[in-house]
Amino acid sequence: MLRAERGGILNVRSLASLLPIPDFAVYAASKSYLTIFSEALRLEVRERGISVLALCPGPVHTGFGEAAGRHGEPPETPSREWFYVPKEEVVRDALIALQGDRARLHPGWRAASLAAAISLLPMAAIRCMMRHRPRRVES
């Protein structure tokens, strides 16, 4: 890409990157790292014609939860189903954002709204919510 002076890099984050989530500390921290890494890399390669996008899609039906061994309430539960972003929408929006030289993207209005709301909350409120959230059930 550097020789060709064109191309794009897509780093997949998570809404978990915005929250200190019990039982997901390493996952959330690694996704948070991607945010700053992507921003710094973008500054390094932008003048060489390379785009860098930090994609934060929120929940998408991909089979990741099952592969990761998550237990507890299934993702098809009606209370959560409305929040999922169709994978086709994520891919379409990511490609458009990458071509448009966007730095970050939360595809779908639900994920974008939640990310905006989280950014406005004080950390004390976020900690309180995380302490009282349902914990995953071990089998």
Placement of each model-derived feature along the sequence:
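Active-site helix of classical SDR
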Residues: 30
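A short helix-coil junction within the Rossmann-fold of NAD(P)-dependent oxidoreductases
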Residues: 1-5
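Conserved catalytic-site region of short-chain dehydrogenase/reductase
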Residues: 17-19
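Residue(s) in the substrate-gating loop at a strand-loop-helix junction
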Residues: 14
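SDR active-site lid
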Residues: 43-110
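Active-site loop immediately N-terminal to the catalytic Tyr-X3-Lys motif
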Residues: 21-25
